[in-house]
Amino acid sequence: MLKSNNASETATSKGVDKAAKKVFFRRRKGCPLSVPNAPVIDYKNPELLIKFVSEGGRMLPSRITNVCAKKQRKLNNAIKIARILALLPFVFQAK
């Protein structure tokens, strides 16, 4: 009987810890590129495009960047064009 009580106590204490951690994590809602005064998605703007590329040179998914599907497609096309025109590297060098 003591073992079952200890197991239930540890399970509840772990559940409380997880719930407490989730309280402090607030995710921004909405697309950062759909707000007023947002920068225009263009292949000639590498400063904007590099924010949506990982350290290894891969395009970040929308679940990480929180960009809507329409803007994500525009970003992907702009990044591809910028790579072809050598405005962005295909693979980033390790520093």
From Swiss-Prot:
The keyword Ribosomal protein applies. One of its GO terms (biological process) is translation. Pfam families: Ribosomal_S18. Part of the 30S ribosomal subunit. Forms a tight heterodimer with protein bS6. GO terms for cellular component: cytosolic small ribosomal subunit. SUPFAM superfamilies: Ribosomal protein S18. Keywords: Ribonucleoprotein, Ribosomal protein, RNA-binding, rRNA-binding. The lineage of its organism: Bacteria, Pseudomonadati, Pseudomonadota, Alphaproteobacteria, Rickettsiales. This is Small ribosomal subunit protein bS18. It comes from Rickettsia prowazekii (strain Madrid E). GO terms for molecular function: small ribosomal subunit rRNA binding; structural constituent of ribosome. Belongs to the bacterial ribosomal protein bS18 family.
